[in-house]
């Protein structure tokens, strides 16, 4: 049973990619783009270099820029460079060189892509020129041709990939450009590209179909020929003959298609395109009659080859057959076929197509002229052996076939081959012309005397066993059957049985059926009488002198045995034999072998050995005497079984026969095979298949034939022999396998003189590598190694050489060539095969291999002047699996498995005595090859778990080597070596060795860490070189092996000291601690601190060995200690580590242990802080360590520890403890009740520190801790929070002189208000005045933090206790907010202030808020625009957020605010407009929210107090803007407001603004309000004559003002809206028109121009309704056409055109 060790080693061997894995090396080396894998694998680096260097010289001749690579990539040194041995930096530099070379040598696809994109853009824009298209097509054609040419060599998958990439780059361009609208030149250029692409590349069917459709759709009359040529090329590349439907439809529409195809056939092949067109025309005949003419023209064009013509005619016949008889389509097809049948060529083609499809043309309704039917095989013939020569009466007589002259008595004689060939050929012609009966009846063949003569039946038997056509073989079998049926009962035809068996294995089913019928006839003709005569018993194979020496005559079976063989064996298997050609021979072998499971075996069986012997002898004698190689190849498998009976026949007949054939001269064997039309290779393989693997004589013969095959003329024999050796090897017995192995090994080392020997050598090496070898074979290989006694004994004299330490002296062999040959032989023959075999019984090989490594290979290494890396690796690789097996044997010895213990123990002791660890250590330490080092380490690992006492003293050098060298390797194999060596074997070894090592160190009064310091330093030094994915596993195994209690702290501290608290080191240290038990983490921290204490003490012990402090100055020592402390402090902050340590305190088995360890950690930290008190940096670092270590504890334990630490008067300790609790409070979970209770219980302790401590830092951290606890868990215990609230609001916190404490206190009070809510009311009288005072100071001093903290508290009080926030508080807050708005503070201050405003708007009452807003409005105005804007924004938000009921209650206040808000300061226009807009928008929004438009008292009050004729006319602007906003907002709901400002106010204001010195802004505001009133007058207020007449005259009078721009933009639209509001009153319009007509005759040109523009606006707006007054206007229009002012004339003409457009008629006649 495989152990875990064996499985691991098997995993290494399976996944290893190192150079020692020959199969993997060969596979990797065989990857090439230029050569086949087999060729590439055989090429050396020297060969590859020469090939590359030749090309490189050519490149340098073309471009001198390549010369720079002659010193790098193409230097002599490049042949020996190994990337796996290069450093990461060296590989990076090499990559840069390779990339530079590739960039220089490859083509430039960027230009090609840019050219294609540019061409597509130009073509799509229609700007292409012939020169450009020619240039583009030339470049693209050359590029496509070149790419396809380059992809024509190399591996198939790479060719397909490159072709696909090219197609993906080219097809989009062709798709864009190959369109008829872009011109014939562009399309023709695309056709050329498609032609090259399809002709040179291997495209898929879908791509070809798509290209054909695109090509045919893009053609025009000018490009038709080019289109057809392109389609012809595409059709040649397609597999199916039918063209795509869209293509065939377009092609069949081409006039005179056949003539066009004939024209282009001179330039390219059009056969498949013509066939596709013909098939397409044939398929559409039923729809279009003209397609019949197209089909006929294409058939008659001569463009189709004979095969394609038959394909078209076959399609025609199939169409006739599949069409419905009597249908129109059927009639058309018959007419077409009849027309084609008038031509003999097409008639023969249709007949052939009909025969191949088994279609009777006459049954289809097609009557053809009679013709000679050719000979055919009827697959459905009966078994009645009818004469095959029956000829139809319609057949035309053919020339008579005569029998050639011959002079043989039997056609199975050895010399009858020539005569048989002539007669057989004549017989085949006779069969084809239905003359077989006359031919066989020829007197010379002796058919009448067939029972007593060998001539006739021997001819037939040889014919059906020959390579003649199936028809001839069938005719021969039928003729023989007919003869057997007419035979006499006294004749025995047993000698035909072997030949009938051959026929039953024929590959043709009709032949096997004929053979079955003949076998039945033979069985019926065989008589059971004892006195029957046997046909062929005399001279069947000629005279005995010509027979084989080992067989003189045919063995004859008894009549009853023949009858049994036929009736009980052959006849039952006939049915299955006819179905399966491979059934008959195995079935016969099973019967003869005596297999009871054979279906063919009769019940009474053939079990007698004598009977079996005679039957085998019968078949063997025929095979020996028959001249036919075919029959031997077929019947040889009958003898492929072992047994007493068969062994005799095989030894006497079969094996000599095989040997005789395989040793025939090549010319003679080739001649025999040529006569029978059998390949010589098949003949050799057929004979060798008769060899049996378990038979000694067969293996011996195979071994002899291997030697025979060294002859260069026997290459085919060699291939067959070696294939047979590989096939029989697994089943061969061990003794015979050793014989074959020796021969193969000898052949593998022969230096080939010719091709034959080279071939044999390669095949021998291949077989030895691929087959499995047992221990006996491997031992045979090892025994071939020369003994050490053949070498000179002892080292040379000291005068000549000195022997270096731990190395063997150099010795000399006979010559250097002997050394090289010996090494080469051992490389392959011994260790390579041994390594690849993994022997199961390694007893003998182990001792022998180890002996070779110590006595032979060390001298050879010295003698050869080389390290013999490959040989050493082979030796070590061979020993490793042997040791694995020996370890299993060792388990047997110790009673873990059942076996012969005494013998096993004796063997195990012998094997252990052969082990020499010093040799392996030398391999590790002195070899420069990583392969040798890795192999030696694997072997040592196995030995360590087997015989650990032998490597105990070499343990530390091995560890040091791994840490300093192997861990830095980047290759996968080194990783696996380290993993296996370290993780498994050395773990076991150290578990047995380390206790002894520790005991030894303690006995010598030495510290354990001091003893292993070198080991630890080696591994930590290699830390940064070890790949990331391997670090954790390696160091965890190191710590586990050495003991985590002692080693873990040392490893962590060494990493911290060496890498100075780097992120990588810190993260790794955390992960390493997480691997082990939580208690080990605490132990590691304690040990870490012990090391730091030792380093800080006056007498250092362990720290000197680990950190090398003796070599450092005092400052350097202090820095080192600081780095260690900082690293530990940072390490303790990791969340994962904290969670890990927490689990230590939750253990139930030993709960006291973690507390004891942690108490020691605290004590040690305090001791350390006292020691380094003189150094502030170290003291601070100790404080951090203490705080962070406290943070490692669970919450309950942390709080208890912190309470104890607060007793300490050292404020830094207090700060650390409180900070730890604060941090824990921020991370604690709400559901953790124990933690929450413990944290709340901590409040009195921290309150005490706040009250008593004189240190600001302590106060700051205390307030912060209280805030954190209250914020997160205050709701859990409101009583505790209430008790601490007074302290926070008192002199020690809120009233402190330190701004930081003030800020924290304010934030803490914010949290307290959140928790206490109503319970916090008592704090307000104390807190709010202080807060307002701090806010005032913050604004003046620009203290942003204090400012924001106050607003945070105020916002929270407003939100939680809004009903207690009085108007006085609010007014104070608003005034301070005004100052804050203009104070120039940060953006965060603005945000906090807006938050406060938002809370005021949402949580305070509307009445109080509006009152405070009104009261503080003057103050806001006095502070500036920002304050005023925010003040109004507060008004807006209050209106938005308050409910309807509250707004109604506060409506009077809101109205007063709106009226008072007009009294604004002197701001600039932009600010004024912004304030006005804000005020108007919010007032309207408030009214809308109340669902009561301002048409009541508010609006009357507003009009009376601030209306257009108030004491302050400048406020009228704001008033009318209000008015416009109201009208626009409430639309038809503002009728009462319209009435309030109509007759009494508006005319007066219009008269006021009509004055020249009136304010233009006021004028625009007044007209804007009027315009909105006109637009929304749905109650017809302005339509009333009283209202209309009142407003009309002052409004129209504004046309006379000098402000032309205002007239156009404001006055005229307002007049137009007034007219539109009275659209149904003609009187109002006439009144308006009268005034306008009067103004048309004004003396002022500006007035006349304004009046004309007003008329234009009215005409546009009112249309025909206004033009009803046209008769009154016409005289005035005529006058204006001749006005003195040019502008008036122009605008008048534009007005006339406008009127004509509305009326649809000219005014010219009316104006005359």
Swiss-Prot record:
Subcellular location, record wording: Nucleus, Nucleolus
Single Gene Ontology BP annotation: positive regulation of transcription by RNA polymerase I
PROSITE patterns given in the database record: HEAT_REPEAT
SUPFAM superfamilies: ARM repeat
GO molecular function: snoRNA binding
Family matches, as InterPro entries: ARM-like, ARM-type_fold, BP28_C_dom, HEAT_type_2, HEAT_Utp10/HEAT1, U3snoRNP10_N, UTP10
Keyword Protein biosynthesis recorded: no
PANTHER family in alphabetical order: BAP28 (PTHR13457), HEAT REPEAT-CONTAINING PROTEIN 1 (PTHR13457:SF1)
Function: Involved in nucleolar processing of pre-18S ribosomal RNA. Involved in ribosome biosynthesis.
Family note: Belongs to the HEATR1/UTP10 family.
Descriptive protein name: U3 small nucleolar RNA-associated protein 10
Species, as recorded: Phaeosphaeria nodorum (strain SN15 / ATCC MYA-4574 / FGSC 10173)
Source organism phylogeny: Eukaryota, Fungi, Dikarya, Ascomycota, Pezizomycotina
């Amino acid at each position: 049973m495989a152990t875990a060790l064996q499985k691991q080693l098997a995993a290494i061997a399976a996944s290893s990619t190192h150079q020692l894995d020959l199969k993997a090396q060969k596979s990797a080396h065989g990857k090439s783009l230029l050569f086949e894998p087999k060729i590439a694998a055989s090429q050396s680096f020297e060969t590859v270099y020469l090939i590359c260097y030749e090309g490189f010289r050519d490149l340098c001749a073309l471009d001198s820029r390549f010369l720079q690579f002659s010193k790098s990539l193409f230097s002599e040194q490049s042949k020996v460079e190994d990337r796996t041995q290069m450093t990461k930096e060296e590989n990076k530099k090499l990559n840069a060189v390779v990339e530079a070379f590739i960039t220089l040598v490859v083509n430039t696809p960027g230009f090609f892509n840019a050219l294609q994109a540019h061409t597509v853009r130009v073509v799509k824009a229609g700007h292409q020129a012939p020169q450009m298209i020619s240039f583009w097509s030339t470049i693209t054609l050359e590029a496509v041709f070149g790419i396809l040419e380059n992809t024509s060599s190399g591996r198939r998958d790479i060719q397909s990939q490159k072709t696909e990439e090219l197609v993906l780059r080219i097809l989009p361009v062709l798709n864009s450009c190959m369109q008829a609208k872009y011109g014939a030149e562009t399309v023709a250029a695309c056709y050329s590209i498609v032609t090259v692409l399809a002709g040179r590349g291997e495209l898929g069917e879908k791509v070809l179909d798509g290209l054909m459709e695109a090509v045919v759709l893009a053609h025009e009359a000018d490009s038709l020929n080019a289109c057809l040529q392109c389609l012809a090329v595409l059709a040649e590349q397609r597999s199916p003959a039918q063209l795509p439907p869209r293509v065939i439809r377009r092609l069949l529409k081409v006039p005179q298609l056949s003539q066009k195809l004939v024209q282009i056939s001179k330039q390219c092949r059009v056969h498949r395109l013509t066939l596709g067109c013909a098939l397409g025309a044939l398929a559409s005949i039923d729809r279009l009659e003209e397609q019949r003419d197209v089909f006929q023209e294409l058939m008659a064009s001569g463009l189709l080859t004979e095969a394609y013509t038959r394909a078209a005619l076959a399609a025609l016949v199939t169409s006739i057959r599949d069409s419905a008889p009597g249908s129109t389509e059927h009639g058309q097809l018959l007419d077409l076929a009849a027309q084609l049948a008038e031509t003999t060529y097409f008639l023969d083609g249709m007949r052939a197509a009909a025969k191949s499809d088994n279609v009777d043309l006459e049954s289809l309704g097609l009557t053809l002229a009679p013709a000679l039917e050719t000979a055919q095989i009827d697959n459905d013939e009966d078994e009645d052996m009818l004469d095959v020569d029956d000829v139809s009466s319609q057949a035309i007589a053919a020339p008579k076939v005569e029998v050639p002259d011959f002079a043989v008595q039997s056609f199975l004689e050895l010399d009858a081959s020539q005569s048989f060939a002539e007669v057989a050929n004549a017989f085949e012609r006779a069969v084809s012309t239905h003359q077989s009966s006359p031919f066989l009846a020829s007197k010379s063949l002796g058919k009448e005397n067939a029972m007593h003569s060998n001539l006739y039946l021997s001819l037939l038997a040889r014919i059906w066993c020959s390579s003649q056509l199936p028809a001839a073989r069938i005719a021969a079998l039928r003729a023989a059957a007919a003869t057997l049926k007419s035979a006499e009962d006294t004749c025995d035809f047993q000698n035909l049985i072997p030949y009938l068996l051959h026929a039953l294995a024929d590959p043709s089913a009709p032949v096997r059926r004929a053979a079955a019928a003949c076998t039945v006839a033979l069985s019926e003709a065989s008589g059971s009488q004892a006195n029957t005569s046997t046909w062929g018993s005399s001279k069947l194979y000629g005279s005995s002198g010509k027979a084989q020496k080992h067989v003189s005559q045919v063995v004859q079976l008894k009549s009853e045995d023949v009858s049994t063989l036929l009736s009980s064996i052959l006849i039952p298997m006939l049915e299955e034999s006819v179905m399966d050609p491979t059934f008959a021979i195995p079935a016969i072998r099973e019967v003869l072998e005596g297999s009871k499971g054979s279906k063919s075996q009769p019940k009474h069986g053939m079990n007698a050995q004598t009977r079996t012997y005679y039957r085998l002898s019968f078949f063997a004698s025929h095979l020996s005497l028959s001249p036919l190689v075919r029959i031997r190849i077929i019947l040889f498998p009958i003898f492929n079984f072992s047994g007493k009976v068969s062994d005799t026949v095989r030894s006497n007949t079969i094996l000599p026969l095989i040997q005789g054939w395989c040793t025939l001269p090549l010319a003679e064997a080739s001649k025999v095979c040529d006569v029978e039309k059998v390949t010589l290779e098949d003949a050799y393989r057929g004979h060798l298949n008769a060899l049996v693997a378990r038979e000694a004589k067969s293996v011996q013969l195979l071994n002899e034939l291997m030697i025979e095959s060294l002859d260069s003329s026997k290459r085919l024999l060699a291939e067959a022999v070696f294939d047979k050796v590989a096939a029989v090897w697994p089943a061969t017995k061990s003794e015979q396998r050793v014989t074959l192995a020796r021969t193969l090994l000898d052949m593998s080392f022969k230096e080939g003189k010719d091709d034959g020997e080279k071939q044999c050598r390669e095949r021998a090496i291949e077989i030895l590598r691929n087959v499995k070898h047992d221990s006996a074979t491997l031992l045979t290989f090892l025994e071939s190694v020369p003994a050490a006694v053949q070498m000179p004994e002892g080292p040379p004299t000291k005068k000549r050489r000195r022997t270096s330490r731990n190395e063997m002296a150099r010795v000399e062999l006979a010559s250097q060539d002997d050394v090289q040959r010996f090494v080469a032989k051992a490389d392959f023959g011994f260790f390579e095969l041994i390594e690849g075999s993994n022997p199961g019984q390694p007893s003998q090989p182990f001792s022998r291999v180890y002996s070779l490594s110590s006595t032979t290979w060390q001298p050879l290494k010295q003698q050869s002047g080389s390290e013999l890396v490959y040989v050493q690796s082979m030796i070590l690789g061979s020993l490793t699996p042997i040791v694995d097996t020996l370890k299993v044997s060792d388990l047997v010895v110790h009673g873990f498995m059942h076996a012969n213990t005494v013998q096993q123990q004796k063997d195990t002791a012998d094997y252990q005595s052969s082990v020499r660890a010093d040799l392996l250590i030398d391999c590790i330490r002195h070899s420069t090859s990583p392969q040798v080092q890795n192999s030696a380490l694997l072997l040592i690992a196995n030995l360590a778990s087997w015989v650990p006492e032998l490597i105990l003293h070499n343990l530390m050098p091995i560890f040091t080597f791994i840490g300093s060298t192997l861990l830095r390797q980047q290759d996968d194999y080194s990783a696996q070596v380290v993993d296996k060596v370290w993780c498994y074997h050395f773990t076991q070894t150290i578990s047995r060795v380390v206790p002894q090592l520790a005991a030894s160190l303690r006995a010598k009064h030495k510290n354990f860490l001091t003893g292993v310091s070198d080991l630890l330093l080696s591994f930590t030094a290699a830390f940064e070189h070890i790949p990331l994915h391997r670090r954790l596993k390696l160091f965890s195994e190191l710590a586990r092996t050495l003991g985590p209690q002692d080693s873990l702290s040392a490893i962590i501290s060494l990493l911290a000291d060496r890498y100075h608290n780097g992120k990588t080191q810190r993260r790794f240290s955390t992960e390493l601690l997480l691997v082990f038990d939580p208690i080990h983490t605490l132990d590691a921290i304690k040990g870490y601190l012990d090391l730091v204490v030792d380093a800080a003490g006056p007498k250092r012990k362990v720290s000197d060995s680990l950190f090398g402090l003796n070599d450092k100055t005092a400052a350097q020592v202090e820095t080192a200690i600081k780095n260690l402390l900082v690293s530990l402090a940072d390490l303790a902050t990791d969340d994962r580590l904290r969670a890990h340590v927490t689990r230590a305190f939750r253990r139930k088995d030993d709960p006291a242990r973690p507390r004891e360890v942690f108490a020691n950690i605290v004590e040690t930290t305090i001791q350390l802080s006292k020691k380094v008190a003189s150094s502030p940096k170290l003291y601070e670092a100790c404080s951090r360590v203490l705080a962070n270590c406290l943070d490692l504890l669970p919450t309950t334990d942390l709080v208890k520890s912190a309470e104890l630490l607060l007793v300490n008067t050292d404020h830094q300790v207090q700060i650390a403890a409180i900070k730890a609790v604060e941090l824990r409070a921020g991370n604690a979970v709400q559901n953790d009740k124990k933690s929450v209770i413990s944290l709340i219980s901590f409040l009195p302790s921290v309150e005490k520190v706040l009250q008593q401590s004189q240190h600001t830092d302590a106060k700051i951290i205390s307030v912060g801790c209280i805030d954190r606890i209250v914020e997160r868990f205050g709701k859990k215990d409101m009583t505790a929070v209430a008790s601490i609230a007074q302290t926070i609001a008192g002199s020690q916190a809120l009233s402190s002189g330190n701004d930081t404490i003030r800020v924290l206190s304010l934030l803490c009070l914010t949290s307290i208000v959140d928790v206490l809510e109503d319970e916090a009311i008592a704090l307000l009288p104390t807190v709010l005045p202080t807060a307002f005072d701090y806010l005032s100071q913050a604004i003046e001093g620009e203290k942003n933090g204090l400012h924001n903290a106050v607003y945070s508290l105020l916002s929270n009080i407003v939100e939680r206790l809004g009903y207690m926030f009085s108007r006085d508080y609010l007014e104070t807050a608003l005034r301070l907010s005004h100052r804050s708005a203009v104070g120039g503070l940060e953006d965060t201050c603005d945000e906090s202030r807006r938050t406060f405003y938002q809370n005021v708007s949402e949580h305070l009452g509307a009445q109080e808020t509006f009152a405070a807003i009104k009261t503080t409005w003057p103050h806001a105005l006095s502070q500036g625009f920002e304050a005023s804007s925010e003040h109004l924004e507060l008004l807006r938000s209050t209106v938005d957020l308050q409910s309807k009921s509250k707004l109604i209650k506060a409506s009077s206040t809101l109205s007063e605010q709106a009226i008072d808000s007009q009294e604004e300061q002197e701001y600039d226009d932009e600010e004024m407009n912004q304030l006005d807009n804000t005020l108007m928008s919010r007032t309207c929004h408030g009214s809308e929210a109340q669902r009561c438009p301002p048409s009541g008292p508010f609006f009357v009050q507003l009009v009376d107090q601030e209306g257009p004729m108030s004491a302050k006319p400048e406020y009228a602007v704001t008033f009318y803007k209000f008015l416009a906003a109201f009208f626009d907002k409430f639309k038809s709901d503002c009728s009462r407001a319209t009435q309030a400002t109509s007759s009494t106010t508006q005319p007066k204001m219009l008269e006021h603004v009509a004055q020249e010195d009136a304010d233009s802004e006021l004028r625009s505001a007044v007209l804007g309000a009027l315009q909105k009133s006109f637009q929304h007058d749905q109650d017809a207020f302005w339509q009333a004559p009283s209202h209309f007449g009142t407003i009309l005259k002052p409004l129209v009078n504004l046309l006379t003002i000098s402000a032309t721009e205002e007239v156009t933009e404001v006055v005229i639209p307002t007049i137009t809206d007034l007219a539109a509001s009275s659209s149904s009153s003609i009187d109002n319009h006439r009144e308006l028109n009268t005034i306008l007509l009067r103004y048309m005759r004004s003396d002022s040109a500006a007035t006349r121009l304004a009046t004309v523009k007003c008329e234009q606006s009215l005409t546009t707006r009112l249309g025909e309704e206004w033009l009803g007054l046209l008769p009154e206007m016409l005289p005035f229009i005529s006058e204006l056409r001749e006005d003195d002012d040019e502008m008036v004339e122009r605008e008048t003409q534009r007005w006339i055109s406008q009127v004509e457009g509305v009326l649809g008629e000219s005014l010219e006649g009316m104006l005359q």
